[in-house]
C-alpha cells in the first residue's frame, strides 16, 4: 500500500476519532438486510434530529475508538457495523429512539451496544432509554403538570361565578 493511501486512511481515522471524542451518545448497530431506500430514510431521520451515521471498516473503528479513549466497544465492531452518534448534549435519547423505531419496524437491525456520556451501555439499557420521551416531550409534560392547579382553580372560580349569576337571576 502506498504511503499516500496510508496517510489518507490515518486522516480518516483521526477525523472520526475527533467526532467520537465529542459525541455524547454512541450506538453501534448491525444494519445488514436493510435496503438502500431504508438506510437512506433512516439516515434522513437521524440527520433531521442532529444525529450522524457512519459506516466504516471495523479496523478503522477500533483505531478511532482507541484514539478517542473509548474502551469497551471493541466486541461490537464485528460484522456489518454502523456507528450512530450525536454531540447534542440536550437530547442524548434521540439516537436510541430513532434506532429503536427502525429496529421495531425492520427485524434485520440489531443494536449491538453503545456509550452514553462516557458510560458503556447495553442493548437493553438503550431500549429503555428509547422509551423515555425527548427533551421537548418532558418539558411539555412538566408544563402540563405545572398548569393543572392553575387551570383547576380557574375552573372553580368560573363555576362559582356562574352559580352566583344563576342565583342572582332567580
From Swiss-Prot:
Pfam families given in the database record: Ribosomal_L10
Keywords recorded for this protein, A-Z: Ribonucleoprotein, Ribosomal protein, RNA-binding, rRNA-binding
Q: What are the recorded Gene Ontology BP terms?
A: translation
- RNA-binding: is it a keyword of this entry? yes
Task: From the record, give the transmembrane residue ranges.
Answer: none
A GO molecular function term, named singly, is: large ribosomal subunit rRNA binding
Instruction: Identify the GO cellular component terms for this protein.
Output: large ribosomal subunit
Family, according to the entry, reads as follows: Belongs to the universal ribosomal protein uL10 family.
Alphabetized PANTHER family for the sequence? 39S RIBOSOMAL PROTEIN L10, MITOCHONDRIAL
- Complex formation: Part of the ribosomal stalk of the 50S ribosomal subunit. The N-terminus interacts with L11 and the large rRNA to form the base of the stalk. The C-terminus forms an elongated spine to which L12 dimers bind in a sequential fashion forming a multimeric L10(L12)X complex.
Q: Which NCBIfam families match?
A: PRK00099.1-1
In UniProt terms, what function does this protein have?
Forms part of the ribosomal stalk, playing a central role in the interaction of the ribosome with GTP-bound translation factors.
Q: Which HAMAP family match?
A: Ribosomal_uL10 (MF_00362)
Q: What is this protein called?
A: Large ribosomal subunit protein uL10
Tell me the organism: Lactobacillus acidophilus (strain ATCC 700396 / NCK56 / N2 / NCFM)
